[in-house]
């Protein structure tokens, strides 16, 4: 979506899991504006975490309109298009599937699933629903990662 050639419409983002990685992601989204002539702008609009003291940090982000302890409330919002999830590993499958089924695109943390079967279930749901999923790896060029390719 683009409002004009000089002012692209923002991609509105929600974060589930506001700990260290959630704060890092929020900071990265804020720095996105430094990218000159980049066709996409990010706008963080909603954050979910079960700890009130973690959510409090996000009050300083002027674009955030929703702070909640319930990820389903975040996912029900029409103003959230993409969701970054940074929760404990054992919650990945459940929350990733909830994100996809809510019609949102997913920025996922590794591991994608706690095992191969979980990863396949998430992948299959994303394909079935036609959702975009990105799992980031900060070390793709380490020897072990290269051997797996």
Provide a role label for each language-model segment.
Residues 12, 54-55, 92, 110, ...:
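Short, cationic motifs built from Arg/Lys/His that form the positively charged side of catalytic pockets
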Residues 35-40, 102, 127-131:
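Short helix-capping segments at alpha-helix termini
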Residues 1-62:
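N-terminal Rossmann-like dinucleotide-binding module
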Residues 12, 43, 79-82, 105, ...:
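Structural signature of beta-strand start/N-cap positions in the alpha/beta core
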Residues 61-125:
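Beta-loop-alpha module in the N-terminal Rossmann-like domain of NAD(P)-dependent dehydrogenases
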Residues 113-149:
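A contiguous active-site-proximal alpha/beta segment in oxidoreductase catalytic domains
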Residues 17, 88, 111, 137-140:
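Structured beta->alpha junctions
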């Amino acid at each position: 979506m683009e409002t004009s050639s000089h002012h692209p419409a923002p991609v509105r983002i929600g974060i589930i899991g506001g700990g260290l990685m959630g704060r890092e992601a929020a900071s990265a989204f804020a720095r996105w504006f430094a990218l000159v002539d980049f066709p996409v702008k990010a706008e963080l609009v909603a954050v979910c975490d079960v700890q009130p003291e973690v959510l409090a940090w996000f009050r300083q982000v002027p674009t955030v309109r929703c702070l909640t302890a319930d990820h389903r409330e975040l996912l029900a919002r029409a103003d959230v298009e993409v969701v970054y999830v940074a929760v404990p590993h054992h919650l990945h499958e459940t929350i990733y599937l909830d994100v996809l089924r809510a019609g949102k695109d997913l920025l996922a943390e590794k591991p994608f699933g706690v095992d191969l079967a979980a990863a396949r279930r998430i992948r299959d749901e994303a394909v079935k629903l036609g959702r975009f999923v990105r799992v980031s790896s900060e070390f793709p060029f380490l020897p072990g990662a290269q051997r797996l390719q």
